[in-house]
Amino acid sequence: MSVTIRLTIRTAVWRSHVARIANAVDEAGGGLVPVVKGNGYGFGRNWLAAVAADFCDTVAVGTMHELDGLPDQLTAVVLTPTLSPPEAPASGSSGPVLTVGSQAHIDALANWGGRVIVKLVSPMRRFGGDHEMVQLAKRAGLHVVGVSIHPPIAGS
């Protein structure tokens, strides 16, 4: 026996909700970075990225493979570290922002010259390295634009 579930989205209401959140984040001095990875939560990653492009200039994707089909005006942050630099960006594009979380990631991207976020380790010890990785990445010719961290779970 199979069960079919049908989900209907009131698109105008949903987009209005997303716009309110994006505006609230902007007013608070932040910048919204939607995560559009995997299958796009059933909507399709490229469709969600196109919607996100109406509200922001940066999206996060899970892997390098998820860069295909993103709107040209979006900057993509790749959350999963890679051991190979991407191909040269299209004309007028600055290319994706990659994540590095270990010396091996830095070594693999050395002299690539692109932008990176350094993933720092948290008390959870889930991923990342210590704060010295920021300087290691810079010395390897990478342009460090920020750091990321997995916050600890409450009570840890």
Language model: regions and residue ranges:
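Active-site-proximal beta-alpha core segment in soluble small-molecule metabolic enzymes
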Residues: 5-9, 13, 30-156
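Gly-rich Lys/Arg/Thr-decorated short loops/hinges at beta-loop-alpha junctions or inter-strand turns
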Residues: 1-2
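N-terminal basic/disordered segments at the start of proteins
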Residues: 7-25
